[in-house]
Amino acid sequence: MNKKYAKKFKKKPCQFCEAKLFYIDYKDIEVLQRFINTFGKIQPSRITGNCAKHQRKLALAVKRARFVALLPFIGDRIRGNYDKTRV
């Protein structure tokens, strides 16, 4: 790729660092669902903008929430229970 046309992307700031949150609660489903895609997978930090420390804590919180059945293991898109007009 020609360097002349290379796009420079600015890294998104970590939402947890900005809010000065040290603990990501696995019972806070509204926060955790923002970081899960329609397939039920955890979104990577390059998309969400999380730093490495908070991405690890987020992954642990999502896994704990799945284990106690607060979050599904698979998303609505795989089950077919999603709004097909949004895709």
Swiss-Prot record:
Q: Which of UniProt's keywords are assigned here?
A: Ribonucleoprotein, Ribosomal protein, RNA-binding, rRNA-binding
Q: Which GO terms describe its biological process?
A: translation
Question: GO molecular function of the protein, one example?
Answer: small ribosomal subunit rRNA binding
The source's superkingdom equals Bacteria
Kindly list the GO CC terms recorded for this protein: cytosolic small ribosomal subunit
Q: Which family does it belong to?
A: Belongs to the bacterial ribosomal protein bS18 family.
Q: How does it assemble?
A: Part of the 30S ribosomal subunit. Forms a tight heterodimer with protein bS6.
The record, for NCBIfam families, names: S18
Q: What does this protein do?
A: Binds as a heterodimer with protein bS6 to the central domain of the 16S rRNA, where it helps stabilize the platform of the 30S subunit.
Official protein name in the record: Small ribosomal subunit protein bS18
* Organism this protein belongs to: Mesomycoplasma hyopneumoniae (strain 7448)
Upper lineage: Bacteria, Bacillati, Mycoplasmatota, Mycoplasmoidales, Metamycoplasmataceae
What is the gene called? rpsR
